[in-house]
Amino acid sequence: MTQLNEKDGFTLVEMLLVVMIIATLAAMIVPRFAGRAKEAKIAAATADVRSSIAAALDLYEVDNGVYPTTEQGLQALVGAPSTPPVPQKWRGPYLKKKGGFNDPWGNPYQYHCPGIHNTEDYDLYSMGPGGTEDGNGQITNWDDPTKS
C-alpha cells in the first residue's frame, strides 16, 4: 500500500483559484447564450406556423378539397374529424403530433378557417412569448413574406 505524502494533492488555495477561474469564465460566457433560448423558441414557432403545420394543412386540403373548420381545428391533422363537414378522403395523419398543438411557450396554436386575415384559406398563429392576443410578438401566417 502506498502512503500519502504531504505534498500529494491540491491545497485549498489551489482549489479556490480553480473555482474562481471557472466562475469567471462562466460569468463571461453564460450571458452570451442567455438570449438564445428566446430566439430558438421564436424560430421554432415560426417554422411550425409557416412550414410544418402549414404544409400539413395544405395536404389535408389537397386530399379533402377544404381545410379543416375552426371547430375541427388542428386535431383534424392527426385524426379524422367526426364533425361536419366529415372528410371523405382523409389520408392522415398529416402530422405526427402527440398531445396538443402548443407553441414553445406552452400556449395552443390558434387556428381559424376561414381566416380573418387570409379569407381564402386560414389564419394560423402563435401568441408568441407574451402569450396574449394583443398582436405584440405574435407569430402569424398572414405576415409571411413567402406566402402569396
Regions flagged by a language model, labelled:
Residues 88-94:
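Short, structured beta-strand/loop micro-motifs enriched in basic residues and often containing a Trp
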Residues 16-32:
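Alpha-helical hydrophobic helix detector
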Residues 49, 70-73:
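Stable alpha-helical elements in mature extracytoplasmic
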Residues 11-15, 36:
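Hydrophobic single transmembrane helices highlighted by the model
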Residues 2, 39-44, 51, 55-58, ...:
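Short, surface-exposed interaction loops/tails
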Residues 1-10:
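N-terminal leader/signal peptides at the extreme start of proteins
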Residues 10, 28, 72:
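Short beta-to-alpha loop/turn elements within the nucleotide-binding domains of ABC transporters
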